[in-house]
Amino acid sequence: MTIVNVITIDGPTASGKGTVAHKVADAVGFHLLDSGALYRLVALASDRAGVDLADIDSLTRIASRLDVKFGPDRVWLQGEEVSLAIRAEAIGNRASAIAVHQPVRDALTQLQRSFRKLPGLVADGRDMGTVIFPDAQLKVFLTASVEARARRRYKQLIDKGISANIEDLLRDLEARDARDRTRAAAPLRPAEDAKLLDTSDMTVDQAVAQVLEWFAAVRPDA
């Protein structure tokens, strides 16, 4: 049977997992799955449709019918490019609230697993190593102090031309962390066999180099 290598990179908001995953995927020539973007797409689509966050049936229906296309640093929803729209903080907060619902997560599970194709996949999110790809060859869990993550998020937003307040971001991150860790559906936690990587005082390149070193040691087709 053909082995499709998978590297999972999980962690809290603004831990650097998206940037690290992108660079690792480029380095090894694998496909990339930004699972958080899927929840943001559900958040955006449901917000535009005026769906209440408590309406689980409608949220699940939107998730199961998600018409999405990914390109290099770009995302389309029903043919409309929404790369910038899904990165708004309000949409991120809405996505975090939506992600607590198990039916929504179930609706997105098969879509996420469909990204597992040759030559391999790097998947970033919050439950990639624990739920979506429990048999991944390498599981990484990124951590960073909430202060370091708030600074990173602030820079990301400002660089994209989105206004931001670092004190508000700090509060939002703390609230999201609490929600992600305590939710009943796939709470944020490292897989038992995950490699832990604290990026608080690391550059992106240092984090990428560490992940690549770990993968070289376990890659079955090396």
UniProtKB/Swiss-Prot annotation:
Q: What is its main location?
A: cytoplasm
Identify the residues that bind ATP: 11-19
HAMAP family referenced in this protein's UniProt entry, alphabetically: Cytidyl_kinase_type1
Q: Where in the cell is it found?
A: Cytoplasm
Keywords associated with the record: ATP-binding, Cytoplasm, Kinase, Nucleotide-binding, Transferase
Q: What protein family does this chain belong to?
A: Belongs to the cytidylate kinase family. Type 1 subfamily.
Q: Which Pfam families does the record cross-reference, listed alphabetically?
A: Cytidylate_kin
Q: What is its EC number?
A: 2.7.4.25
Q: Which GO terms describe its biological process?
A: nucleobase-containing small molecule interconversion; pyrimidine nucleotide metabolic process
NCBIfam families the record matches: cmk
| Recorded GO MF terms | ATP binding; CMP kinase activity; dCMP kinase activity
Q: Is the keyword Cell membrane in the record?
A: no
**Entry protein name:** Cytidylate kinase
* Highest taxon in the source lineage: Bacteria
Q: What is the lineage of its organism?
A: Bacteria, Pseudomonadati, Pseudomonadota, Betaproteobacteria, Burkholderiales
Spell out the reaction equation it catalyses. Answer: CMP + ATP = CDP + ADP; dCMP + ATP = dCDP + ADP
Q: Which GO terms describe its cellular component?
A: cytosol
